[in-house]
């Protein structure tokens, strides 16, 4: 393979890698930005009290979010089945929480299916996040 073709191939790979990194950076967010997005999608204002009720209430699968994340999400939790430690959910205590849209969506999708038996709706996500953002 001639040198120029190899070099061109490397340039294409480098450009693709850079585009992927930039796309990942575009998913970075703040909890307030995610809250605004969920509220806009839901078409209603988020209510922290509804978020707390949803988080602590047992749902159809007999679990609550608080089963693993504790009723005080400023503290670390523990998965009830695996025993795996879970970092605090409150953004004020854990600066990594709710800073990546893709990761936030992944965990909402997985955990809501486990706890509620379905994906959470935008208004539920907004309410939960609004409540978590009130915790210091």
Language-model segments: what does each one mean?
Residues 29-59:
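Electrostatic cytochrome c docking/interface patches
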Residues 77-84:
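Short cysteine/histidine-rich zinc-coordinating motifs and their immediately flanking basic loops
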Residues 86-102:
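Short microdomains enriched in Cys/His and/or Lys/Arg
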Residues 2-13:
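Bacterial N-terminal signal peptides that target proteins for export
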Residues 60-72, 128:
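The canonical Cys-X-X-Cys-His
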Residues 105-136:
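C-terminal capping alpha-helices of c-type cytochrome domains
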Residues 17-26:
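C-terminal segment of classical bacterial N-terminal signal peptides
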């Amino acid at each position: 393979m001639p040198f120029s073709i190899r070099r061109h191939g490397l340039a294409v790979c480098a450009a693709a890698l850079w585009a992927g990194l930039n796309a990942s950076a575009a998913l970075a967010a703040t909890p307030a930005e995610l809250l605004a997005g969920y509220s806009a999608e839901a078409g209603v204002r988020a209510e922290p009290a509804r978020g707390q009720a949803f988080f602590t209430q047992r749902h159809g699968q007999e679990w609550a979010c608080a089963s693993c994340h504790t009723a005080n999400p400023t503290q670390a939790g523990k998965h009830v089945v695996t025993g795996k430690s879970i970092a605090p959910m409150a953004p004020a205590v854990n600066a990594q929480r709710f800073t990546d849209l893709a990761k936030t969506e992944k965990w909402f999708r997985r955990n809501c299916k486990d706890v509620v038996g379905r994906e959470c709706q935008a208004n539920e996500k907004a309410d939960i996040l609004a409540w978590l953002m009130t915790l210091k």
